[in-house]
Regions:
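Hydrophobic residues embedded in beta-strands of well-ordered beta-sheets
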Residues: 2, 150-151, 213-214
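Conserved N-proximal alpha/beta basic substrate-recognition cap immediately N-terminal to
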Residues: 2-90
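Short solvent-exposed loop/turn micro-motifs enriched in small/polar/acidic residues
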Residues: 26-29, 135-138, 198-201
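A short beta-strand motif that forms the metal-chelation/ATP-contact edge
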Residues: 41-43, 96-99, 143-145, 212-226
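Glycine-rich phosphate-binding loop of ATP-grasp-fold ATP-dependent ligases
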Residues: 63, 72, 96-120, 139-142
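Phosphate-binding site of ATP-dependent enzymes
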Residues: 110-194
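C-terminal active-site "lid" helix and adjoining low-complexity regulatory extension at the edge
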Residues: 181, 195, 199, 208-271
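Hydrophobic residue at the +6 position relative to the catalytic HRD Asp in the kinase catalytic loop
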Residues: 204-206
């Protein structure tokens, strides 16, 4: 038995789309409705419920790593992959963006211009906080990675380009990026960050200013709202079912072929 394991209110549409187009019989279970059956292979879709399986993709520990935005930001900061970030109030430089340890969907974000506004933002964080430099980004991408290779890339177009958080749940849209148009500096940084996470698959959020790409976070249950992205993920997951899990080495060409997942090489029409 092979299935996706999701939790309530997370990943229903994405998981059902993968199941519908899988050629290897991938199923799906919701952790709060059924006790997950013993399986040969389980893909954890942001779900850390107990499960018995011979092989598991996205270990509980890795999901916890990226869900703790503060601790993972420390990892990214030490590697120079994210905006300059501060973890102590006295170190913060302005303007700065303050966020709590855990957050999602572009919520719980405060832009601070001075010490009083910083203290007010910190007081709104019931837990620890981190603050990062405010980047006037010109573009933002989500890079979908499976087994260390890129399955697809989407660019975010916000409803309000002046907003700090470009989150599609608050308006705006994703548009698929064609292979030849993949921004290679973004792809390179995304793969580096992904390999630090311990995940087997996920969505890496990247913002861009000039030639510089900055990692924001990694999602262990990336929303697949496009039929194209759904098919890309399904192809990559079916590849794992047929050939086994494990990280795939990068190619040698200095173009998209260096990074693209081998399951995606066959042309998929962009919808």
């Amino acid at each position: 038995m092979i299935y996706l394991l999701r939790r309530r209110n997370l990943g229903k549409g994405s998981c059902n789309a993968i199941v519908a187009s899988s050629t290897t019989g991938i199923g799906v279970f919701r952790s709060d409705l059924y006790y997950p059956p013993e399986a040969d292979l389980v893909f954890r879709w942001g779900c850390t419920a107990p499960v018995r399986a011979t092989s598991i993709l996205n270990k509980v520990e890795a999901i916890h790593v990226v869900s703790d935005k503060l601790e993972f930001r420390k990892v990214l900061d030490t590697q120079g992959l994210c905006p300059k970030t501060w973890f102590q109030e006295e170190d913060v430089k302005f303007p700065a963006v303050v966020r709590p340890r855990t957050h999602h969907q572009g919520r719980r974000l405060w832009v601070c211009q001075d010490r009083p506004s910083l203290r007010a933002a910190i007081s709104r964080c019931a837990e620890d906080f981190y603050a990062s430099e405010l980047i006037n980004k010109t573009a933002e991408y989500r890079v979908f990675v499976v087994s260390g290779r890129v399955a697809c890339v989407a660019r975010k177009f916000p409803a309000n380009p002046d907003a700090v958080a470009w989150n599609v749940y608050q308006g705006g849209r994703f548009e698929n990026v064609r292979w030849d148009d993949w921004p290679l500096p973004v792809i390179k940084v995304a793969v580096r960050a992904f390999l630090l996470s311990g995940l087997d698959f996920g969505g890496v959020d990247i913002m861009v200013l000039g030639p510089k790409a900055y990692v924001l976070e990694i999602n262990s249950a990336p929303s697949l709202t496009s039929p194209y992205r759904q098919r890309c993920f399904t192809k990559a997951f079916d590849w794992i079912v047929q050939k086994g899990k494990g990280f795939l080495p990068l190619g040698t060409r200095e173009n998209y072929r260096k990074y693209i997942h081998p399951a995606i090489i066959e042309r998929i029409s962009d919808e």
